[in-house]
């Protein structure tokens, strides 16, 4: 049972909450390099449209571009046959877009602007900003610079949305260290129809992994080491997957990416807490590791893709592809245990 959940929140949340325990597995299907296209570095998010078509967002030098990706896969094996890209639109009035989700109710797109601390709706053809509102709780505005919202996922029925900050909000504790992870609030929003605003419907505490490697300093001798959440993905049964990424040094600077399945069955709803340290005791979300990769691909975007012939689903990931990382596309096979 969830603890400290209001009657309204519980009625909105429980019907789409996955059952207690862990039930999913991931297997690598294929990994390829996407095209080297101008303005296509710093890819931060991806969302599935239909069949082989995805939308992905890049934010190179704070110039946001949404791309249409054509990624056909073999229906039997999940092998990626190609990755083709074309410019879809340039969303107006954006600054630091890190996440994208297609709205299944009307086909529009929602974008996360980390620096502006906003989730806004756009026309995917013209890039024009559209009416639409996400009522972010005040506590979510207390994020650290460059550690704000990067993730976004919407349920297949279009009535539930999830996001979170990359690492802990300032009143909730420190950033991740080599000894301890960072406490992040997984935030859920709901609406009754496409025209209605998204309203808060719960927050649950998730602890990221501690940093496994040694500090990574840039040319200015700034410590770039971090371990936080770069993406969320909501499955049809209500299960929430998290994508954690780490920058650190083992023998050389490298990226460590992990995908976790979550279990909320014993977690406490902390929506009404202004600071985790000041409130009553709470229970965190449980998690189970499904996939881990270490190397030079910095995976930041993740979404569900089409079904394969055996009923499993593709989980598609894209790497940032900036000067420090590869421009990779990773297809994983998601199936029940």
Model-flagged regions — what are they?
Residues 3-15:
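Bacterial N-terminal signal peptides
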Residues 16-337:
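Sequence/structural signature of beta-propeller domains
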